[in-house]
Amino acid sequence: MTSVASEPLSSQKRWIVIYPAYIDKKKTAKQGRKISQILAVENPTSVEIHDVLAAVGFNPLLERTKCYPRDGERDFEVQGRVRVQLKNDDGTAKHEQKTRDEIFKMVAEMIPKLKTRQPGYTAPSVASSSAAAAGKKNKKKK
């Protein structure tokens, strides 16, 4: 069995892991928050973390079935984690964010700017289903 340390840095096993609890404002440091509460964001999801990292230029890997070990509630919305490559095989930084903490802070800063976090946003599936239901109500019987 080979150790993870012997794998190249580009191997997905060597990528850093980001759980939503790491940047959740409602979590304490004991519950797993890794950045200061001032910089943290309320109720981040693994999908939001993935979207932010993809928009910035990272190549993130979303693992929806994984759970944070310290999280007792195991809610499906916050379930999941994201893996990101931090360094190239030669040890140089892959992006301008060189450390885990820099990536955590950047993600927490960008999540409130997502469309889904803007006031007045409705999910497309909710809007289309309500329009379809409204169309059915207006039908007349023959």
From Swiss-Prot:
Residues 123-135 have a biased composition (Low complexity). The keyword Transit peptide does not apply. Component of the signal recognition particle (SRP) complex, a ribonucleoprotein complex that mediates the cotranslational targeting of secretory and membrane proteins to the endoplasmic reticulum (ER). Binds directly to 7SL RNA. Mediates binding of SRP54 to the SRP complex. Transmembrane segments: none annotated. The keyword RNA-binding applies. One of its GO terms (cellular component) is signal recognition particle, endoplasmic reticulum targeting. Belongs to the SRP19 family. Pfam families: SRP19. One of its GO terms (biological process) is SRP-dependent cotranslational protein targeting to membrane, signal sequence recognition. Component of a signal recognition particle complex that consists of a 7SL RNA molecule of 300 nucleotides and six protein subunits: srpa-72, srpa-68, SRP54, F37F2.2/SRP19, F25G6.8/SRP14 and ZK512.4/SRP9. Keywords: Cytoplasm, Nucleus, Ribonucleoprotein, RNA-binding, Signal recognition particle. It is found in: Cytoplasm; Nucleus, Nucleolus. This is Probable signal recognition particle 19 kDa protein. Residues 115-142 are annotated as: Disordered. InterPro entries: Signal_recog_particle_SRP19, SRP19-like_sf. Its main location: cytoplasm.
